[in-house]
């Protein structure tokens, strides 16, 4: 299946974010060179430590090579999944407001909107500010979707170049991994060509060798053959992700992209493929985005939307029958 592409005529992203990191002399840190952007700048592991256990004073992320198994980490208990906010600022406001109630907030792609009258470089500046707010409010990771692509990376394939600034600011993004307690979160980019696909395939193999008790992926497009990719007319999923799930069997994959799936009687916000739970909250109008709350301690996941709420047990062998229709 052909992957959705960036908008025709997309220009290379130019940084205008006013909150660049400042060096010790008070000077604005320059943009990374082109060769340091995209996949070349990826691959960090964020070990989020307990305050006072050797991390930052605020308990924020510290960078480490490998999986840092000797470090004491705080476990993930509650996860908030949202995706496809598409530059809907009231929905970003809501996410910032509720973020302190969660151990991890996952923005699973399509943060920008290529159909908006607001230029992508302006949108990216605003969304980067929201990521800074989310970082201050709690722990956040963000992966790219097809709407987030702003120009070619060092390999000449389309990439969300602007997200490199999120990483510099301490927000894990495309190509990074986060370790909290017994959980590893792998953040997957929206790949736009064979080199990107190959890089992700190789990375998942490397990450599998570091796999702890629980492995979670953030990946924008749901897998092919799943009700989480049903549009109401066709199965619109990612065949490559389906293969990777079958091969690696992560515990949870957090997706988006197909807005309609949870709102169709034969679609869903949740699916189980082997031992893997796949979630897609979908997209809705209004100031509160459709979202999925996952409580790992309670072993539950719940979908919240204008249509109502549905819940499942993570120990279930399959997703339950839909109840909002």
Give the predicted meaning of each segment.
Residues 86-91, 112-116, 143-154, 193-195, ...:
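Active-site environment of divalent metal-dependent phosphoester hydrolases
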Residues 178-181, 242-247, 261-325:
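Binuclear metal-dependent phosphoesterase catalytic core
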Residues 148-240:
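Conserved catalytic scaffold of divalent metal-dependent phosphoesterases
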Residues 81-83, 105-110, 141-146, 172-173, ...:
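Active-site neighborhood of phospho(di)ester-bond hydrolases with catalytic His/Asp-centered motifs
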Residues 102, 241-245, 249-255:
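Proline-aspartate-enriched helix->loop->beta-strand connector
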Residues 87-179:
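Core catalytic region of metal-dependent phosphoesterases/phosphodiesterases
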Residues 78-86, 182-191, 216-220, 276-283, ...:
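Active-site-proximal beta-strand elements of phosphoester/diester hydrolases
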Residues 37-38, 42, 50, 65:
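Short Gly/Ser/Thr- and charged-rich N-terminal loops/segments
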């Amino acid at each position: 299946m052909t992957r959705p592409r960036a908008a025709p005529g997309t220009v290379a992203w130019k940084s205008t974010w006013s909150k660049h990191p400042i060096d010790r002399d008070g000077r604005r840190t320059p943009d990374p060179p082109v060769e340091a952007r995209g996949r070349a700048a990826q691959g960090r592991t964020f070990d989020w430590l307990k305050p006072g256990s050797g991390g930052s004073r605020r308990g924020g992320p510290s960078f480490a090579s490998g999986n840092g198994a000797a470090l004491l980490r705080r476990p993930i208990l509650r996860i908030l999944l949202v995706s496809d906010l598409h530059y809907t600022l009231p929905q970003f406001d809501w996410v910032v407001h509720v973020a302190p109630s969660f151990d991890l907030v996952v923005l699973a792609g399509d943060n920008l909107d290529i159909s908006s009258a607001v230029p992508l470089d302006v949108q990216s500046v605003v969304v980067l500010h929201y990521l800074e707010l989310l970082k201050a409010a709690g722990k956040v990771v963000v992966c790219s979707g097809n709407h987030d692509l702003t120009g070619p990376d060092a390999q000449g394939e389309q990439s969300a170049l602007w997200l490199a600034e999120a990483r510099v600011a301490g927000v894990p993004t495309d190509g990074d991994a986060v370790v909290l307690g017994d959980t590893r979160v792998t953040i997957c980019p929206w790949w736009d060509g064979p080199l990107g696909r190959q890089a992700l395939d190789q990375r998942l193999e490397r990450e599998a060798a570091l796999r702890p008790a629980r492995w979670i992926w953030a990946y924008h497009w749901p897998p092919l053959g799943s009700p989480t990719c049903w549009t109401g007319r066709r199965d619109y999923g990612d065949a490559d992700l389906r293969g990777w799930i079958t091969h690696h069997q992560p515990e949870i994959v957090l997706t988006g992209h197909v807005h309609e799936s949870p709102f169709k009687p034969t679609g869903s916000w949740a699916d189980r493929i082997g031992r893997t739970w796949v979630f897609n909250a979908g997209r809705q109008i209004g100031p509160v985005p459709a979202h999925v709350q996952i409580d790992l301690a309670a072993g539950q996941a719940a979908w919240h939307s204008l249509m109502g709420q549905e819940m499942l047990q993570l120990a279930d062998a399959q997703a339950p029958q839909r109840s909002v229709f």
